[in-house]
C-alpha cells in the first residue's frame, strides 16, 4: 500500500488552466466513484476548489497508481496525460502526508494561513466517506489532518491578521470603533477594490453601506449586487454629515475628498468620530484632512505597513505550524506500521486458540467422564500455556512496527508460524481483478 497525492495548484498551473480542471460540485460524487473503480486505487479523496484540484489515493503500486490517476484526470477534463503531468506535482509517502497537512492548515494557500481550505478539505473527506471511497487509512489520516489544522489555527491565530489592503481597511475600522455594527459607511468607487472592501464590511456586520461613484450606473450595479444603498458622487458632502467610515478607491487623478469639504462637513457633524481610509493610487483623499481630534485619516502606505507587519506575523505562525508537521508525519507512520502488525497478531492468536479448542475437543473424546469443574480447569490452564507461549512472539511482532524492513520481517514471521494475515483490501482487489477479467473477455469477443 502506498499513499500518493497528485496536485494541480497555483504553483503548477495558471488560473486559465486551473479553471479547466475543476470539478463542478454536482460532478464530484461521480468522479469519486469513477476513480475508485480504476485499477490500483484502494482509497481515494478528491479536493476541488477555485485554486486547486487534488487527488489523494492509497494505491497498490506507485507507478501504476500514478499513471491511472493522471489518466483519470486527463479523461475527466479532456487533456492528454502528458498535459496533466506538466501541470501537476506528485507527492508519495511521507511527502504526500506532509502535503496534506500543509494544504489543510492553509500553509500551501495563495493567502497564507487562510481557513477556508480547512472546511473544503473536511467537505471533500466527508463526501468520500459518504460514497465509501475511503477506508481504514484515510479515515484515520484525514481526521488527523483536520484535527491538526484546527489546533494549529487555534494556537497561533494565523488567520486573524489582515494580509490584503481591503481587509486591512476593515480591520483598522475595528480598531478605531470596536464593534462595527450600526456604523454608517460610504464606499467611494465601484471597482474591484471597492467590492472587496464592501464584502469585508458586510462580513464584519455592517449593513448601513452606501456606494457612491462618478458614474451612477456603476454604483447602482455594485450596490444592487450586494443589497446595499447607492448614490451619486455629488451627494458625498451630504452623506459625510452622518457617516462614520469612508473607504475610497477610485482611479480619479484629482482628490475626491478635500480638506475644505471636511472643514465644511465638520461644522454640521456632531462630535462623533469620522474614519477616512484611502486605498487609491493616486490618492483620493487630500492629505491633512484630519483637522480635528475626532477625524482619522489613513492612506494606502499606512495600510501597507499594517499588512506587512501582519504578513510577518503570519509567516512566523506558519513557520511554527510547519515545525510541527514532521511529528505528525511520524505519528501517522507509527500508526500505519502498527496497522500492519495487528492482523498478524490477530492471525497468530486465532491459530493458537483454534489449536486450544481442538485440543479440548480431543480431551473430551478421550476423557468423557471429566466433570465440568475439571474441564474448566484444564481449559483455563491450556489457554494460560498458549498465552505464555505467545507473549514473546507478540512482543517481537509489535517491535517490528518500527523496523525499516517491517514488511519483509512480518512476512517471515507469518511463514515461521504458518499464518496468513488478512489483507484489508482483499475484497477491493478481488473486485478489480474480476472487473479486469470481464473487460478482457469482452475485448476478446468484440468484433468492433
UniProtKB/Swiss-Prot annotation:
Keywords: NADP, Oxidoreductase, Porphyrin biosynthesis. Substrate binds at residues 49-52, 109, 114-116, 120. Its EC number is 1.2.1.70. GO terms for molecular function: glutamyl-tRNA reductase activity; NADP binding. NADP(+) binds at residues 189-194. PROSITE patterns: GLUTR. SUPFAM superfamilies: Glutamyl tRNA-reductase catalytic, N-terminal domain, Glutamyl tRNA-reductase dimerization domain, NAD(P)-binding Rossmann-fold domains. NCBIfam families: hemA. Homodimer. Possesses an unusual extended V-shaped dimeric structure with each monomer consisting of three distinct domains arranged along a curved 'spinal' alpha-helix. The N-terminal catalytic domain specifically recognizes the glutamate moiety of the substrate. The second domain is the NADPH-binding domain, and the third C-terminal domain is responsible for dimerization. Belongs to the glutamyl-tRNA reductase family. This is Glutamyl-tRNA reductase. The gene is hemA.
